[in-house]
UniProtKB/Swiss-Prot annotation:
Localisation per UniProt entry: Cytoplasm
Keyword Protein biosynthesis: yes
Gene for this chain: prfC
GO biological processes: regulation of translational termination
Protein's name in the database: Peptide chain release factor 3
UniProt KW Signal keyword: no
Organism in which the protein naturally occurs: Pseudomonas syringae pv. tomato (strain ATCC BAA-871 / DC3000)
Amino acid sequence: MTQQAAEVAKRRTFAIISHPDAGKTTITEKLLLMGKAISVAGTVKSRKSDRHATSDWMEMEKQRGISITTSVMQFPYRDHMINLLDTPGHEDFSEDTYRTLTAVDSALMVLDGGKGVEPRTIALMDVCRLRDTPIVSFINKLDRDIRDPIELLDEIEAVLKIKAAPITWPIGCYRDFKGVYHLADDYIIVYTAGHGHERTDTKIIQNLDSDEARAHLGDEYDRFVEQLELVQGACHEFNQQEFIDGQLTPVFFGTALGNFGVDHVLDAVVNWAPMPLARVANERTVEPEEEKFAGFVFKIQANMDPKHRDRIAFMRICSGRYEKGMKMRHVRLGKDVRIGDALTFFSSEREQLEEAYAGDIIGLHNHGTIQIGDTFTEGEALGFTGIPHFAPELFRRVRLKDPLKSKQLRQGLQQLAEEGATQVFFPQRSNDIILGAVGVLQFDVVASRLKEEYKVECAYEPITVWSARWIDCADKKKLEEFENKAVENLAVDGGGHLTYLAPTRVNLALMEERWPDVKFSATREHH
């Protein structure tokens, strides 16, 4: 096995998906703690010594305590290298989240044991299903009142259309939470709360039939054994292949806040989740063990460091090895660039990188030339597929408070659109600027970032747009006819693509019927 193949085999790259408030930020911190990456989970002490979650860094995130931007963290665990991508958990997230899921090989779904499957989880699972991403599930908050665990498993299966195979089973909950029982290996892991940075030593009781197990469960023993028989009779058994194919999810129970059960999940990722997978490019399939470097950009983040007005492009390495100072071909521009200062991420801490392998996420300094979906190789012309733009669901017209700043506004919006914080449309028949978003919070984020980073103040006005569709037509003459007829509703997006802004659902249906040769697309690939 070559050194490169050995390095690839060590990698596990996964994202955490959850509904807001299911405990995602807490579990992220505890995972980092497992890799001893944070000394006190949740504390990166600033001079004021205020506690902010380690992976929530943008000003607005600090104020609201939610992760709006995708963070990337790398840490070692059990001779493996873990790349953890944190996705925005807030009610209103952007397509940033969807795109992050194109850069991982597996995902960890966190559910609130008191609430079960929630709307945002469903949306994220739909995206995972597009790529058959393997999912590990963690039912959180067992230190509080939770719903009946069997009911929770039924809900996962019915709503998320995936088989659920419990690996551990909870013994009580809330004040009576005594730990979990490992179904396949017949042992109990005793619950002792470890808060903050405490890593408690795990106490294990072998064999449910033992006197020690009976003493630990007390009066609950008979009822628990009865429940287990029911569970083992009714639930799916874990099957590695079905998990890899995205058809079955292993389910673990615990409490991230109490620092219990998180290590079981991380062990599952190391033991069962796939190492970096082959990636499909337009030209061919790229294998991770190949010698030549290839990677794609799935996200651009502006101003990660207020001290430097910089933008960072996040790249997933698909094959080969990055070495400091190496020459790469920026395929879209056909230009060779020397990259001497790629970054690795440990949340807001960044370090210069000497080398990286397939599965790793690295950061490139971007001075406006890199776009989402761009490919970098050692010369080969490759373009990776499946990094989509999604049609926005909400629209606002932008009004500038100071008309003299229209240049700064356009520049700011162009940059924010490039990094996926919003989508911007310029109607053909007016000088309006229209913003599109997947969630309302995106508009707030854009306004506050325009103000902080570009010194532009703007307000929003409602606008009658129901949805956007990207336009394509092979027949030039037909396209011209369509453009003349539909000019009132046509716009160009930030990437220069022709877009139809449909005022109503009915209008869109009519247009699609009237113009069968014109393709109205709800997603568009980054080119």
